[in-house]
């Protein structure tokens, strides 16, 4: 939850194909969520819950560009249904390309991230969200210290567009680069 009025950020793959989305808080309060927008290419979705008279606790964005290899990171999630699980590690790499497209370069962390952590926050030691936990690389299916998060600075821009327009607007340049052969040059 990133605002007191009930804006929720998660991964697109968490909500993809859902007919109904329910957000469950730590105190077991349940809210039906409205999908404001999603970006499958960046794997981000923005939801809205109506807090009614409930005061929501929310988190703030940090500056992911300030993170350096070796900085501490803290992941919170719901791995295997174990809600509120907190793990810690370090930033292992920045701007990691996983080959999933040109839109996001990931923060890599060795904080334990497992199935169920997707869409959860990756924090710095100041309690600011520096990333959205998104993926792991593992041959066993469990965490082996190769976790990846969408950097907050990338996510913030996408989240704002999803809130404003329901989709992400990207520029596109219709240019194709190819070698100039002798025949083509003539």
Write out the residue ranges for each language-model feature.
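Serine-dependent protease modules
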Residues: 1-186
């Amino acid at each position: 939850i990133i605002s007191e009025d009930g804006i929720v950020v998660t991964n697109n793959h968490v909500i993809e194909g859902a007919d109904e989305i329910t957000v469950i808080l730590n105190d077991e309060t349940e809210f039906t969520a409205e999908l404001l927008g999603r970006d499958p290419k960046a794997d981000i979705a923005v939801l809205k819950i109506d807090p009614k008279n409930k005061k929501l606790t929310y988190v703030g964005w940090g500056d992911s560009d300030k993170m350096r290899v070796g900085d501490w990171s803290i992941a919170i999630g719901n791995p295997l249904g174990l809600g509120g699980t907190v793990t810690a590690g370090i930033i292992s790499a920045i701007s990691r390309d996983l080959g999933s497209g040109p839109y996001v370069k990931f923060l890599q962390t060795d904080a334990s991230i497992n199935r169920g952590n997707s869409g959860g926050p990756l924090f710095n030691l100041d309690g600011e969200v520096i990333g959205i936990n998104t993926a792991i690389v593992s041959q066993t299916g469990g965490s082996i210290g190769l976790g990846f998060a969408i950097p907050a600075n990338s996510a913030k821009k996408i989240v704002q567009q999803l809130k404003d327009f329901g989709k992400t607007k990207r520029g596109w340049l219709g240019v194709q680069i190819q070698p100039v052969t002798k025949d083509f040059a003539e």
